[in-house]
From Swiss-Prot:
Reaction catalyzed: Endohydrolysis of (1->4)-alpha-D-glucosidic linkages in polysaccharides containing three or more (1->4)-alpha-linked D-glucose units
Organism: Homo sapiens
Cofactor names: Ca(2+); chloride
Origin superkingdom: Eukaryota
Note on how the cofactor is bound: Binds 1 Ca(2+) ion per subunit. Binds 1 Cl(-) ion per subunit.
Modified residues (Pyrrolidone carboxylic acid): Q16
Gene from which this protein is expressed: AMY2B
Protein name: Alpha-amylase 2B
Length: 511
């Protein structure tokens, strides 16, 4: 009995770090700005059969409808109420999506905007996605309801009321982030309204939350809110399951607020990951892929079991957030596929794949003046995600998660789950390879010359299908074939001019 109790306690303590994905599913995808009806379809027709574990959805609660500029993506980070009513859909559509995705084993993670309400300069009225009245000037949000008592105006000590100095941890938490009205999260009433919103989502069936702007909330206030949350819906999750929590904290070093301040609440976004990996794959600042041998904690990242990792996110793919120009995105497709491939093959962290939309980039003095542009739309109504005959997406939806190289690496990660990082090779430059136990092996050529070498893969003998150049279909391979001999060795040849200069094989790609 003692042993059982000990296990139970450990299980309980670790609960918020576990993603609640179905057994054998190891990644989630951010379907940025997608409509709930399209996500429900995507769960059924693509994500479930391809082995994706879940979807991070855009904030589902009512937000300001901003018309200047016209309907920017960031309007969704300006809450008006906790009604489930946005451009992505209403509450019925949200419930339908959660049910349909859970029924095929794909989880839903909500981007929860709980640090603040709308900007202080937004005009009073009903320009909101559900028509609720709000008056930022008088701190009046009757659809919640919040009033002047529920904000941090009295606590913030800066002249402007906004955050002015990131070296002052107190103002980062108690003042307004770019003018957004900062909620008084130490008040039990405010905590209760937020918990009520999150519990509504949990009861519908969501599996966890991305906590937006966690750096701007005191870790103790977050904990107090999490302590009020329900267990997950037992229709889909084991009894007693806790929501998966991952907190958005931008910590590139050099500031008093650290990612580690938040480990007690759940996982944390590791922004160093994409910033550093982009620098390495771009070969900037003398970086090379051979240096990736001790990738992860060896690079000064947080512990693997606390990290949520990604190559790019909705902020830094358009120059917001962290990482600057080193961040790789779908605009840099060749290098991007290599970076995502490396991330999905490497055991560090819990992985999130990005799925974007195109927008008309326009650089002036190094800045994209169109970085605000919202999702593909007809006069403000988000466009359907159409699927082309070749399985790519139309209507300016990029759907990186459907690119063969990325989708197949999501499966690679599932196949090698739990296997150690083994058989590292590098040429001292940008040709590297590594295995995952006896289940998978991947080789990269990011040098300006051909790679041709026999390497120890650790895999059983046989013919394998490279899942980067093709697919294993009915026992045949549409891409490059790799022959592993009885001693586990295989010859790899990768031209530096190859469309995708990397090769990946795994136990389930064996012919």
């Amino acid at each position: 009995m003692k042993f059982f109790l000990l296990l139970f306690t450990i299980g309980f303590c670790w609960a918020q770090y576990s993603p609640n994905t179905q057994q054998g599913r190891t990644s989630i995808v951010h379907l940025f700005e997608w409509r709930w009806v399209d996500i429900a379809l995507e769960c059924e027709r693509y994500l479930a059969p391809k082995g994706f574990g879940g979807v991070q959805v855009s904030p589902p609660n009512e937000n300001v409808a901003i018309h200047n500029p016209f309907r920017p993506w960031w309007e969704r980070y300006q809450p008006v109420s906790y009604k489930l009513c946005t451009r992505s859909g209403n509450e019925d559509e949200f419930r339908n999506m959660v049910t349909r995705c859970n029924n095929v084993g794909v989880r839903i993670y909500v981007d929860a905007v709980i640090n603040h309400m709308s900007g202080n300069a937004v005009s009073a009225g009903t320009s909101s996605t559900c028509g609720s009245y709000f008056n930022p000037g008088s701190r009046d949000f009757p659809a919640v309801p919040y009033s002047g008592w529920d904000f941090n105006d009295g606590k913030c000590k800066t002249g402007s009321g906004d955050i002015e100095n990131y070296n002052d941890a107190t103002q980062v938490r108690d003042c307004r982030l770019v003018g957004l009205l900062d909620l008084a999260l130490e008040k039990d009433y405010v905590r209760s309204k937020i918990a009520e919103y999150m519990n509504h989502l949990i009861d519908i069936g969501v599996a966890g939350f991305r906590l937006d702007a966690s750096k701007h909330m005191w870790p103790g206030d977050i904990k107090a809110i999490l302590d009020k949350l329900h267990n997950l819906n037992s229709n889909w999750f084991p009894a007693g399951s806790k929501p998966f929590i991952y907190q958005e904290v931008i910590d590139l070093g050099g500031e008093p607020i650290k990612s580690s301040d938040y480990f007690g609440n759940g996982r944390v976004t590791e922004f160093k990951y994409g910033a550093k990996l982009g620098t390495v794959i771009r070969k900037w600042n003398g970086e090379k892929m051979s240096y990736l041998k001790n990738w992860g904690e060896g690079w000064g990242f947080m512990p693997s079991d606390r990290a949520l990792v990604f190559v790019d996110n909705h902020d830094n793919q358009r120059g917001h957030g962290a990482g600057g120009a080193s961040i790789l995105t779908f605009w840099d497709a060749r290098l991007y596929k290599m970076a995502v491939g490396f991330m999905l093959a490497h055991p560090y962290g819990f992985t999130r794949v990005m799925s974007s939309y195109r927008w008309p980039r326009q650089f002036q003095n190094g800045n994209d003046v169109n970085d605000w542009v919202g999702p593909p739309n007809n006069n403000g109504v988000i466009k359907e995600v159409t699927i082309n005959p070749d399985t790519t997406c139309g209507n300016d939806w990029v759907c990186e998660h459907r690119w063969r190289q990325i989708r197949n690496m999501v499966n690679f990660r599932n196949v090698v789950d739990g296997q150690p990082f083994t058989n590292w090779y590098d040429n001292g430059s940008n040709q590297v390879a590594f295995g995952r136990g006896n289940r998978g092996f991947i080789v990269f050529n990011n040098d300006d010359w051909t790679f041709s070498l026999t390497l120890q893969t650790g895999l059983p003998a046989g013919t394998y299908c490279d899942v980067i150049s093709g697919d294993k279909i009915n026992g045949n391979c549409t891409g490059i074939k790799i022959y592993v001999s009885d001693d586990g060795k295989a010859h790899f040849s990768i031209s530096n001019s190859a469309e995708d200069p990397f090769i990946a094989i795994h136990a389930e790609s064996k012919l």
